[in-house]
From Swiss-Prot:
Function: Histones H1 are necessary for the condensation of nucleosome chains into higher-order structures.
Region described as Disordered: spans on this chain: 1-41, 92-213
Protein name: Histone H1.3
Modified residues (N6-(beta-hydroxybutyryl)lysine): 35, 53, 65, 86, 91, 107
Localization: Nucleus; Chromosome
Positions with biased composition (Basic and acidic residues): 107-119
Length: 213
């Protein structure tokens, strides 16, 4: 009865981390939604101002109506709209035609509008750095050249074999050298034979001297 109780206990512990993972995913998804809704405030403002046909510029009230029509929560993001307008004016994207601060009327600067269109070719210029990525395949070619060099090295290997051939001839010469000492040994005993009679002659001289006495 104790064994099944032990096996049943770890099961709920395994399920709990899975729930934590699901809970962790939810705030991440919410943060992604907030990010998607947050940053484009300035973009929405520029689009609304560009869409307006008023020569004197778009007022804040008209801008809010345009944003609300696009599904943007104007009441909650009122401060963001004002900050977005100020930042766009400071950048030169919008020109304030009437009033001061965020309470005036705003118009899209023609120079800024043309400047916004120009960054698109800059993106094409940003695509130029991709060429170095195309240059990277050249490295494998160098590696292929290295492989060719490796293939050439085995051709050099036969040369040491040719050098090994004289080594085969060298063992013959020590054999000749081995024969020559044998001859020298044969000569030495011959030279020793004449040495033997010399002491005999010396003994003969000594005996002759004794006889003279």
């Amino acid at each position: 009865s104790e064994a099944p109780a032990e096996t049943a206990a770890p099961a709920p512990a395994e399920k709990s981390p899975a729930k934590k993972k699901k809970a962790a995913k939810k705030p991440g998804a919410g943060a992604a939604k907030r990010k998607a809704a947050g940053p484009p405030v300035s973009e929405l403002i520029t689009k609304a101002v560009a869409a307006s046909k008023e020569r004197n510029g778009l007022s804040l009230a008209a801008l809010k109506k345009a944003l609300a029509a696009g599904g943007y929560d104007v009441e909650k993001n009122n401060s963001r709209i004002k900050l977005g307008l100020k930042s766009l004016v400071s950048k030169g994207t919008l020109v304030e035609t009437k009033g001061t601060g965020a309470s005036g009327s705003f118009k899209l600067d023609k120079k800024a509008a043309s400047g916004e269109a120009k960054p698109k070719p800059k993106k094409a210029g940003a695509a130029k750095p991709k060429k170095p990525a195309g240059a990277t395949p050249k490295k494998p070619k160098k590696a292929a050249g290295a492989k060719k060099a490796v293939k050439k090295t085995p051709k050099k290997a036969p040369k040491p074999k040719a050098a090994a051939k004289p080594k085969v001839a060298k063992p013959k010469s020590p054999a000749k050298v081995a024969k020559s000492p044998k001859k020298a040994k044969a000569v030495k005993p011959k030279a020793a034979k004449p040495k033997a009679p010399k002491p005999k002659a010396a003994k003969a001289k000594k005996t002759a001297a004794k006889k003279k006495k």
